[in-house]
From Swiss-Prot:
Quaternary structure annotation from Swiss-Prot or TrEMBL: Homodimer.
Gene3D superfamilies reported in the protein's UniProt record: 3.40.50.360
Binding site residues for FMN: 17-19
Protein name: FMN-dependent NADH:quinone oxidoreductase
Top EC class for this record: oxidoreductase
Taxonomic source organism: Clostridium botulinum (strain Alaska E43 / Type E3)
Function, in words: Quinone reductase that provides resistance to thiol-specific stress caused by electrophilic quinones. Also exhibits azoreductase activity. Catalyzes the reductive cleavage of the azo bond in aromatic azo compounds to the corresponding amines.
Entry-linked PANTHER family: FMN-DEPENDENT NADH-AZOREDUCTASE 1, FMN-DEPENDENT NADH:QUINONE OXIDOREDUCTASE
InterPro entries in alphabetical order: Flavodoxin_fold, Flavoprotein-like_sf, FMN-dep_NADH:Q_OxRdtase_AzoR1, NADH:quinone_OxRdtase_FMN_depd
Amino acid sequence: MKKLLYITVNSKPENLSASKTVGRAFVNRFLEKHSDFEIEELDLYKCHIPRLEYEYFEKRSCLVNEDAFNKLDKKQQEEVHKIVKLTDQFKEADVYVIAAPMWSMSFPAPLKEYIDCIVMDGKTVDIKDGEKPEGLLNDKPRGAVYIQSSGAKMNVLLKMVMDKGVHYIESIMKFMGIEKFEELLVDGTGTTEEEKNKAIEKAIENIDSVIDGIW
């Protein structure tokens, strides 16, 4: 079966998180429309993400060779194994759904830490000295969706200035070779439950068109 990797980046439980509420509605609808998929879930607030240390790398975005690995202590070796596991999990998927709130014009830090782990030479990208890096995830059909919640309602101009997260995620996906990308915004969650529910309902109405855009 094909695999949908559902990545959440919010410490709130699903019933309190607008992005995770819409994310759940999205993946459920996707699986209804595409029965040949199975889902794998990754909560970046519950999953350990290694901090990248220089000892783990032979060169930029390239993990150490076997000899250097054997010189690491047990904890360091476990961290390298975790990086490999996260990268392999990402590479094996066909569709990626990331649900996160907009924080500080971007997204919560665990998502950046995760991305730093999976952008790996020889697995998701090909990096050669003196040459432009090339994404390796164009080897089969793939698609990605970024679901983002934000308290404010943003017009086009404000979005260009304030919303860096969507643009970064789209850029990093395409950098790895994933060309099909869609955003699903949960804008205007505001400060009241009514505002939040309206924003969620509006986003859910767009789910089918977003699914059709990636698969």
